């Protein structure tokens, strides 16, 4: 029985030792974030609640610039109800596929990792809802399809409970 428990524990620990992003290491085309987020981009997206119901749609015009390992991505959102929002990301290429991101509504620092054609971000966003601000965790996955197109799917949660998903389609102009 002790051997069975030890084997089960070892199997569980080894399954936890590799990052989920590593499964994409061989996927092509390889994502060069500084190249993709350089220049003008356009995106279309939506938010769905945890039941899958469509809550909000939006369009985003973006401009990215890089100087060495430092980048800036200016995002201008227009939501389906006519409201507008701007977010400015300050990005840092830390090397070895690691990125950091900061924005005014991001609590702390977003941590990103690239493997193959996939980027996974983890961050907490201060999200205003009906006059209150909630800190919501994002598990954000970006999938490069070709040098002009990317699909982004982010899961939002609070206290470990899924709130919904954001889906975006990016196109370089």
Predicted segments, located by residue:
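Sequence-level preference for short, compositionally simple segments enriched
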Residues: 22, 60, 66, 140, ...
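Bacterial signal peptide processing site
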Residues: 17-19
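Central antiparallel beta-sheet cores of small beta-barrel/beta-sandwich binding domains
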Residues: 44, 48-129
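Sec-dependent signal peptide recognition
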Residues: 2-7
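N-terminal helix-cap/turn-to-beta initiation motif at the start of protein domains
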Residues: 24-40
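C-terminal motif of bacterial Sec signal peptides marking the signal peptidase cleavage site
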Residues: 12-15
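A short, Trp-centered hydrophobic/proline-enriched beta-strand micro-motif
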Residues: 37-46, 152
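Glycine-rich, aromatic-bearing surface loops/beta-hairpins
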Residues: 139-173
């Amino acid at each position: 029985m002790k051997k069975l428990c030890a084997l089960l524990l070892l199997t569980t620990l080894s399954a936890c030792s590799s990052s989920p992003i590593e499964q994409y290491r061989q996927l092509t085309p390889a994502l060069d974030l500084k190249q993709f987020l350089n220049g003008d981009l356009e995106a279309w997206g939506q938010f769905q609640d945890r039941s899958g119901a469509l809550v909000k749609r939006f369009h985003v015009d973006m401009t990215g610039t890089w100087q060495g390992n430092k980048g800036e991505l200016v995002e201008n959102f227009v939501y389906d109800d006519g409201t507008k929002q701007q977010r400015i990301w300050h990005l840092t290429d830390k090397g070895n596929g690691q990125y950091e991101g900061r924005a005014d509504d991001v609590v702390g620092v977003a941590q990103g990792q690239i493997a193959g054609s996939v980027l996974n971000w983890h961050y907490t966003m201060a999200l205003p809802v009906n006059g209150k601000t909630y800190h919501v965790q994002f598990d954000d996955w970006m999938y490069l399809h070709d040098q002009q197109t990317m699909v982004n799917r982010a899961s939002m949660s609070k206290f470990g409970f899924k709130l919904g998903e954001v889906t975006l389609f990016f196109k370089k102009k």
